[in-house]
Amino acid sequence: MPNRRPFAPAWIVAALGCVLGSHSAVADNHAACAAGKTLEDGVLTIATGNPAFYPWVLNDAPESKEGFEAAVAYAIAAAMGFEDNQVTWVRTSFDEAIQPGAKNFDFNMQQYSITAEREQMVDFSLPYYTSAMAVLTTEQAVADGLEPTIASLKGAIWGADANTTAVPMLSEMIAPDADPLLYGDNVDVTAAMQAGQIDAALFDLPTALYLSAVVVNDGVILGQFPAERSENPDQFGLLMEEGNPLKECVDAAITELTETGELRAIESRWLQQVTGVPVIE
């Protein structure tokens, strides 16, 4: 029998054309929005840390598009109508960028939490990341049988900074069998963990990533909870000079990436799969 190429009914072709045309129109609108609003015409200048750290940027090379914030930056740039070769990177310190005044970037990505105090000096975009709460523990606790399940976590010895929301969150998310041991600050919490006095503690994921890599010997992030289960979680925004007219264009791009699920997919890849931190349901 002769091979016959399957064909699409006319209504499918028409519908597909509408979808593609709509997507193209959205991209064109975003590009029109950004026109004349960047530091350098036709170029999007993005700042990151010096150096930039895993898993936000891999190998301190944001131009590789590898790492959560590097990938988000290029996704936002594309949604705003910029090609990869129209993106340029500069470096700043964390504190330097928060200060009021003129900036040498269009926006800065360094895990900046959106706060009312900071918004008095700079502008923030809509959030591109809502921080999940994560369980920090040690290799010894894992070897002793601690697992990323609610049943296992209930039996752990927990520690917490008495001055933070970690205590009510522990009660709400896990309801441990024993009351957590309370400390004056997170330094004391991590010291107690290293001394073997507690099995685990609850931190936002960015803090847990830092503590496991730099502070706690043999530190392990056992798992993370869905961000929507956290009360008033930290939200990261792109930092911009106060009054930057590009903000509306950036916000439109982030809204599009949120609605299409692209931001969630980037988060899943770089903050779950690559880090190996499972989600505790």
Where are the language model's segments positioned?
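Extracytoplasmic small-molecule ligand-binding "clamshell" domains
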Residues: 29-111, 120
